[in-house]
Design a protein with these regions (language model features):
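Short, solvent-exposed secondary-structure boundary/capping segments
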Residues: 104-115
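Intrinsically disordered, low-complexity Pro/Gly/Ser/Thr-rich segments with frequent PxxP/GP/PP motifs
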Residues: 299-332
Length: 372
């Protein structure tokens, strides 16, 4: 997996995954065309590439030999990527392929976009400023399973979780290797390999057609799967806030409702990315959640770290991403809170988690039996 990170259009990193045997390097060489104003960027400190080369490499697991896996394309400044677009994730470095886009409403507390929609604050939530929503493109993608071991320390091996399609309210299933990726995190490339991504759903969802651009086109099974499971896959709202150079992005998803004795229990999944935008090394130590339910209850949850980890965010590895779940005995509610971080000197500081809605959208349960 090429593990270079593009930030604000600049890519200049070399990562050594195995100190004894395996090296991965990335060369990024965009020519100045159109509105793409970027310098030529070389991700090699040992002059192992010819200066005219425009490919990124992925090493074979058994040795030092580098093999070509594709050729970079210029990122799209306007418009969206199509189904079948191969890409490298600019933050986590994995290879992936676009399945289809989502048009989300981004609520960014760090800017004041000119948009018509706004999100009101829930009772007791921090802050009082109005937040405007702006349309932003995200993508449902498949992750190359070969790259999952290399990103496990910075991100969970992403999976879409869902409730079982039978009466067992405790059952939770997952489709591993699915992720949601923002438009600016896409580094597009092309490949002549007919199976460039290793994932059990790749050949089920996509087929190779060299006469098309991109050359991987959707099968009917992908269209049917998207249509059938649209309510539970749909990404609608994204919330973002930065405190002392730590940016927190939250994406909630409604999963469905289950009956529990005499009440209904509504379930949501939420994905959180923590990103260090500064140079100082910090470590996440604690989480503090407040969960407000439409039924009138307010719950406080405290704990060490997140998902059993206390990730360190540094300039070399600035981001960490994870997913979790929450349930309410009401069709809607709100969540917000803080993360406590520790600096190198030992002092602590709090980072705000932006308030986000838990909405059921009036959905009724639909089975996820299509893939199984």
């Amino acid at each position: 997996m090429a593990a270079c990170v593009l930030r604000q259009g600049l890519l200049s990193t070399f990562r050594k995954f195995n100190r004894k045997h395996t090296y991965r390097a990335l060369y990024f060489n965009f020519h100045s065309t159109g509105d793409l104003q970027r310098p030529r960027l070389l991700c090699s400190t040992w002059n192992i590439f010819d200066i005219q080369q425009k490919r990124f490499m992925s090493s074979r697991p058994e040795g030092k030999v580098l093999e070509t896996v594709g050729v970079f394309e210029a990122p799209k400044q306007h418009g969206k990527y199509e189904t079948g677009q191969l890409f490298l994730h600019s933050v986590f470095g994995y290879r992936g392929i676009v399945l289809f886009p989502w048009h989300a409403r981004l609520y960014d507390r760090d800017v004041s976009p000119q948009a018509a929609e706004s999100k009101p604050e829930p009772p007791g939530a921090h802050g009082s400023k109005e937040v405007k929503g702006k349309t932003h493109t995200y993508y449902q993608v498949l992750i190359d399973t070969r790259d999952c071991p290399h990103i496990s320390q910075r991100s969970q091996t992403e999976a879409v979780t869902f409730l079982a399609n039978h009466d067992d309210s405790r059952a939770l299933y997952a489709i591993p290797g699915l992720d949601y990726v923002s438009h600016e995190d896409i580094l597009p490339y092309n490949s002549t390999d007919q199976i460039p991504i290793q994932h059990e759903l790749f050949e089920r969802f996509l087929m190779y057609n060299p006469s098309k651009v991109p050359c991987f086109v959707p099968r009917d099974t992908l269209r049917a799967w998207q249509e059938k499971n649209h309510p539970w896959l749909e990404l609608s709202d994204v919330h973002r806030e930065t405190t002392e150079n730590i940016r927190v992005t939250v994406i909630p998803f409604y999963m469905g409702m289950r009956e529990a004795q005499t009440s209904h229990v509504y379930w949501w999944r939420y994905c959180i990315r923590l990103e260090n935008l500064g140079d100082e090394v910090v470590q996440l130590r604690e989480r503090h959640w407040r969960i407000f339910s439409l039924s009138g209850t307010l719950e406080t949850v405290r704990g060490r770290g997140v998902v059993g980890r206390e990730p360190v965010l540094s300039k070399e590895q600035p981001a960490f991403q994870y997913s979790s779940h929450v349930s309410l005995q009401a069709p809607s509610g709100h969540m917000w809170g803080t993360f406590s971080f520790q600096r190198g000197g030992g002092d602590m500081f709090d980072v705000a988690i932006p308030s986000f809605s838990l909405d059921s959208h009036g959905h009724r349960d639909s089975p996820y039996s299509f893939l199984f």
